[in-house]
């Protein structure tokens, strides 16, 4: 667990790339006015199975190993009369990189957003978090 619950930014983008021997998944945020200059609260962990949130149904994500990332952010703006989606990008990526095979949104409920990452095998990874992004870097399988 890392980051601060006091910083709940807008969730705006997901980038998935493989470059220089590293498969990278980046979640991007827009800070809200007055928010502290710290990363949003997040949890990143290996899990045996990915499930949808909040239903708990099994998620069909390709892979032999799975990483779940949960972060506090707004994917929908509820401040007006009608809800407005903030994150309007894809909910699923199937890059089939050497290590990262699939990235899929598992849930977006009450400012808690979860995504699953399917890997070709269990691999050590690095997490880099700033107020405007959380990046997971996996060495490309050889």
Segments predicted by a language model, with ranges:
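Short linear recognition/processing motifs and adjacent strand/loop elements at protein termini
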Residues: 1-142
């Amino acid at each position: 667990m890392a980051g601060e619950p006091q910083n709940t930014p807008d969730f705006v983008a997901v980038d998935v790339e493989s470059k220089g021997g590293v498969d990278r998944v980046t979640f991007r945020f827009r800070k809200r006015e007055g928010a502290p200059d710290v990363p949003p609260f997040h949890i990143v962990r290996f899990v045996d199975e990915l499930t949808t949130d909040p239903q708990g149904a099994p998620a069909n994500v390709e892979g032999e190993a799975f990483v779940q990332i949960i972060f506090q952010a707004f994917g929908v703006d509820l401040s007006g009369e009608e809800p407005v989606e903030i994150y309007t990008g894809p909910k699923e990526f199937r890059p089939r990189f050497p290590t990262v095979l699939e990235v899929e949104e598992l849930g977006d409920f009450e400012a808690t957003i979860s995504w699953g990452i399917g890997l070709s095998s269990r691999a050590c990874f690095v997490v880099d978090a700033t107020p405007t992004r959380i990046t997971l870097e996996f060495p490309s399988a050889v």
